[in-house]
């Protein structure tokens, strides 16, 4: 089986073409391949499939390092777009893909960045999903003997966003896993720790569901900006600095799609005999 290793700001992926190859990945196999000592090593496995819908170019599947399948990965979407162009699976600059949670358009820019239409952020609790009687801009959660104020949103996957004074000293190792599996998130959640520098610039660390803290999380960056705009703390165009680098997020508010722009890097190609 042939594959490529790619990354978006250090958030790394094994990308597999299932259009021209017959592949099957059990959760156990994914865990073995994800191991950084004895396998390929990656945060997520991305699979390129033939479209289920004739209006789409491809179907996009994402698996975490623990073998669980998820509906969205923003950094992965940018790598997906670069991969299908690099491998000659498509020549268009605007690539339409379906996912578990809907549809996306991935656009290659003139400077080889990738702009992803991430769709409209979803704040209704039952769509996140998040257990709450009604939608609020801020929720109070009790976790790890602490009281936490957070925003909750779905970007195709569930996110919880906490504002912190300094990401360097944020209790990511304690609050990340505790909030990820909090009882009010029935499908677990990705946890973002956001430091606001000014209305157009934030710093962010993300503890990803099923993975742990990563160098970057595209959907997490989108979620943080969406929550910041909803809470009237941020403007519509925001630079997000993550440990692995920067992303640029644009959202014009309710009823409009959110756009994420950033890099996608090809590292190497490989072959595995399974």
Curated annotation (Swiss-Prot):
SUPFAM superfamilies from the UniProt entry: Diaminopimelate epimerase-like
Keywords, ordered alphabetically: Amino-acid biosynthesis, Cytoplasm, Isomerase, Lysine biosynthesis
Subcellular location: Cytoplasm
Active site: 73, 217
Residues the UniProt record annotates as site (Important for dimerization): 268
Gene Ontology terms, MF aspect: diaminopimelate epimerase activity
Keyword Cytoplasm (UniProt): yes
GO cellular component, one term: cytosol
Site entry: Could be important to modulate the pK values of the two catalytic cysteine residues: 159, 208
EC number assigned by the record: 5.1.1.7
GO terms under biological process: lysine biosynthetic process via diaminopimelate
Recorded catalytic activity of this chain's protein: (2S,6S)-2,6-diaminopimelate = meso-2,6-diaminopimelate
Biological pathway: Amino-acid biosynthesis; L-lysine biosynthesis via DAP pathway; DL-2,6-diaminopimelate from LL-2,6-diaminopimelate: step 1/1
Main location: cytoplasm
Positions of substrate binding: 11, 44, 64, 74-75, 157, 190, 208-209, 218-219
Family: Belongs to the diaminopimelate epimerase family.
Subunit structure as annotated in this protein's UniProt entry: Homodimer.
Task of the protein: Catalyzes the stereoinversion of LL-2,6-diaminopimelate (L,L-DAP) to meso-diaminopimelate (meso-DAP), a precursor of L-lysine and an essential component of the bacterial peptidoglycan.
Protein name, entry field: Diaminopimelate epimerase
UniProt source species: Photorhabdus laumondii subsp. laumondii (strain DSM 15139 / CIP 105565 / TT01) (Photorhabdus luminescens subsp. laumondii)
């Amino acid at each position: 089986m042939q594959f490529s290793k790619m990354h978006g700001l250090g958030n790394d992926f094994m990308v597999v073409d299932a259009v021209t190859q017959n592949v099957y990945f059990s959760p156990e196999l994914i865990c073995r391949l994800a191991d950084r000592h004895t396998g390929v090593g990656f945060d997520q496995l991305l699979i390129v499939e033939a479209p289920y819908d004739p209006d789409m170019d491809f179907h996009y599947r994402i698996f975490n390092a623990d073998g669980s399948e998820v509906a969205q990965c923003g950094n992965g979407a940018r790598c997906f777009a670069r991969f299908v162009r690099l491998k000659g699976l498509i020549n268009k600059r605007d690539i339409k893909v379906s996912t578990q949670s809907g549809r996306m358009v991935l656009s290659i820019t003139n400077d080889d960045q990738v702009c992803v239409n991430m769709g409209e952020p979803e704040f209704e609790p039952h769509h996140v999903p998040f257990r709450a009687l009604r939608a609020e801009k801020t929720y109070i959660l009790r976790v790890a003997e602490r009281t936490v104020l957070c925003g909750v949103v779905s970007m195709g996957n569930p996110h919880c966003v906490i504002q912190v004074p300094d990401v360097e000293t944020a209790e990511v190792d304690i609050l990340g896993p505790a909030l990820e599996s909090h009882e009010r998130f029935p499908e677990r959640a990705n946890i973002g720790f956001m430091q606001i520098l000014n209305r157009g610039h934030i710093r962010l660390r993300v503890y990803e569901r099923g993975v742990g803290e990563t160098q970057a999380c595209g959907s997490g960056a989108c979620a943080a900006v969406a929550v910041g705009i909803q809470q009237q703390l941020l403007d519509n165009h925001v630079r997000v600095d993550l440990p692995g680098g920067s992303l640029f997020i644009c959202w014009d508010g309710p009823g409009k799609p959110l756009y994420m722009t950033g890099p996608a890097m090809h590292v190497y190609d490989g072959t595995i005999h399974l």
